[in-house]
């Protein structure tokens, strides 16, 4: 700052990349040396190895505020929820060991660590998980839970702006899933809400999906999809159940986008966990990410495909940057 002409009248900003894993450290060094602004991104996403992660630098400044004497206006209790939203909409998963927002950030497996945390959490936790909005669910929500308890759980997760109609639809979907798999965890409930609140998630509606597959059998799928032009029924074979379902869906909706990404993950660790499928579809210059949530992976796969296809069909897709090969061809 001392080297900049009229340095006291300008805001110095840091813009760091994580090529050597030093993006957050370099940004904090900038603050120590007079920077008043940090350019950062949620989950550290960005070019090459990424940029400085907002959640890391914000919590570092908060936890070590006595040292940095710097403050932000970030509502830290929304960090975890926003991180998961970015993960969902970009299709870029948060690594389990990611600082602040990773699944393991507040997990303790070592016996001596567990003992220490039980006696005094600050022994191994530099911050309270609730500071970033990670709070354990107080209520156990299952098939016998009422609407009032369901709505209270949503409010505890930060969903306080839902309309009565939205709560009604979410509750109906929750009861449907709870009947199949049992109680839902806070993480599963959040995934359910986000998948159902998507504006294009109902552009194409999955009415029915069934498939036949097994050793020596040709994988075959039948789907019924509700489109803006009415219901469509289609049957197709494929290399596996998911491939057969996707080919049947393409025939039903009249779109044949290219599948660029397909990822399956369990929202929690048990065999009864909700499955979350993320897909990225490309249609010409357009691309869209879709997410499906269900205790049935095949159904979740179908929901994810229809979610992304709905964005492509409804004009809510993003423009896909050309590949190196396309640039060379002059596309």
From Swiss-Prot:
Keywords: Amino-acid biosynthesis, Branched-chain amino acid biosynthesis, Cytoplasm, Leucine biosynthesis, Manganese, Metal-binding, Transferase. It holds the Pfam family HMGL-like. Mn(2+) binds at residues 15, 17, 51. Residues 205-331 are annotated as: Regulatory domain. One of its GO terms (molecular function) is 2-isopropylmalate synthase activity. InterPro entries: 2-IPM_HCS-like, 2-isopropylmalate_synth_dimer, AIPM/Hcit_synth_CS, Aldolase_TIM, LeuA/HCS_post-cat, LeuA_allosteric_dom_sf, PYR_CT. Belongs to the alpha-IPM synthase/homocitrate synthase family. LeuA type 1 subfamily. This is 2-isopropylmalate synthase. It catalyses: 3-methyl-2-oxobutanoate + acetyl-CoA + H2O = (2S)-2-isopropylmalate + CoA + H(+). It is found in: Cytoplasm. GO terms for biological process: L-leucine biosynthetic process. The keyword DNA damage does not apply. It comes from the Bacteria. Pathway: Amino-acid biosynthesis; L-leucine biosynthesis; L-leucine from 3-methyl-2-oxobutanoate: step 1/4. Residues 1-80 form the Pyruvate carboxyltransferase domain. The keyword Transferase applies. It comes from Thermus thermophilus. Its EC number is 2.3.3.13. Disulfide bonds: none annotated. Catalyzes the condensation of the acetyl group of acetyl-CoA with 3-methyl-2-oxobutanoate (2-oxoisovalerate) to form 3-carboxy-3-hydroxy-4-methylpentanoate (2-isopropylmalate). Homotetramer. Gene3D superfamilies: 1.10.238.260, 3.30.160.270, Aldolase class I.
């Amino acid at each position: 700052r001392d080297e900049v002409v009229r340095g006291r009248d300008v805001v110095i900003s840091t813009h760091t990349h994580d090529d050597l894993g030093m993006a957050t450290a370099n940004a904090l060094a900038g603050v120590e040396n007079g920077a008043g602004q940090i350019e950062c991104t949620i989950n550290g996403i960005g070019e090459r190895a990424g940029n400085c992660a907002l959640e890391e630098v914000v919590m570092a400044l908060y936890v070590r505020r006595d040292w940095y004497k710097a403050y932000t206006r970030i509502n830290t209790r929304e960090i975890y929820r926003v991180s998961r939203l970015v993960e969902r909409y970009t299709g870029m998963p948060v690594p389990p060991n990611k600082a602040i927002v990773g699944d393991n950030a507040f997990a303790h497996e070592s016996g001596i660590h567990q003992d220490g945390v039980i006696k005094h959490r600050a022994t191994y936790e530099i911050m309270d998980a609730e500071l970033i909005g990670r709070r354990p669910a107080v209520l156990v929500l299952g098939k016998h839970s009422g609407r009032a308890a369901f709505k209270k759980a949503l409010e505890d997760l930060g969903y306080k702006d839902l309309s009565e109609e939205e709560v009604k639809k979410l509750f109906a979907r929750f009861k449907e899933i709870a009947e199949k798999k049992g109680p839902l965890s806070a993480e599963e409930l959040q995934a359910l809400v986000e998948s159902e609140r998507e504006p294009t998630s109902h552009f194409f509606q999955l009415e029915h999906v069934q498939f036949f597959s097994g050793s020596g059998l040709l994988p075959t799928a039948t789907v019924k999809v509700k489109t803006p032009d009415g219901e469509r029924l289609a049957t197709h074979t494929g290399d596996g159940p998911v491939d057969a379902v996707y080919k049947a869906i393409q025939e039903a909706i009249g779109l044949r986008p290219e599948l660029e990404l397909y990822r399956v993950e369990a929202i929690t660790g048990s065999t009864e966990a909700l499955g979350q499928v993320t897909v990225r579809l490309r249609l010409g210059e357009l691309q869209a990410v879709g997410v499906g949530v269900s205790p049935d992976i095949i159904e979740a796969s179908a929901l994810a495909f229809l979610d992304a296809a709905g964005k492509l069909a409804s004009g809510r897709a993003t423009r896909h940057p050309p590949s190196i090969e396309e640039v060379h061809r002059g596309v």
